């Protein structure tokens, strides 16, 4: 029996520690594949031909604002409709009119992120479990651990 297809999530984050944290969170959702880009241009290149089920975008990227990047990503085939989340330390950012459906404030809260990942990606809810060994991130930041 073939393994079920994993659902792809694109995360754009320029701070390696935040990227590692998100990768560790995603270790609790093996049905999801997290792809991490560190800036807008890399995100555009990664997104070509992908069909992510969810977009997670930091706002303060080195080459653009996350809202501008979202507008550019929406022009790519297959990226017109996936939910987009602003992931930011700027809790005052207003998402109205930006194309984001939610704002996740940093620092992230594990239970909230896992519950929202389940809902937004269509996964059945999973119980919160304690990790028995350190998470191994699947990204270009893996060498930092």
Please annotate each region the language model reported:
Residues 108-121, 129:
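C-terminal output helix
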Residues 13:
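Conserved acidic carboxylate
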Residues 36-54:
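Acidic, metal-coordinating helix/loop segments flanking the phosphotransfer/catalytic sites
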Residues 85-88:
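Hydrophobic/aromatic residues positioned on beta-strands within the core alpha/beta folds
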Residues 62, 92:
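The feature encodes the CheY-like receiver
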Residues 16-35:
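Two-component/phosphorelay signaling modules centered on CheY-like receiver
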């Amino acid at each position: 029996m073939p393994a079920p297809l994993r659902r792809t999530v694109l995360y754009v984050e320029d701070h390696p520690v935040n990227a590692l944290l998100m990768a560790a969170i995603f270790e609790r959702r093996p049905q999801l594949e997290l792809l991490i880009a560190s800036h807008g241009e890399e995100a555009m290149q990664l997104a070509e031909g992908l069909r992510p089920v969810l977009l997670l975008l930091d706002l303060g990227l080195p080459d653009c604002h996350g809202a501008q990047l979202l507008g550019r990503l929406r022009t790519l085939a297959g990226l017109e409709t996936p939910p987009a989340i602003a992931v930011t330390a700027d809790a005052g950012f207003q998402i109205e009119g930006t194309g984001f459906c939610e704002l996740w404030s940093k620092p992230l809260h594990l239970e909230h992120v896992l519950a929202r990942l389940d809902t937004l990606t269509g996964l059945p809810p999973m119980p919160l479990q304690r990790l028995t060994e350190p998470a191994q991130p699947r990204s270009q930041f893996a060498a930092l651990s």
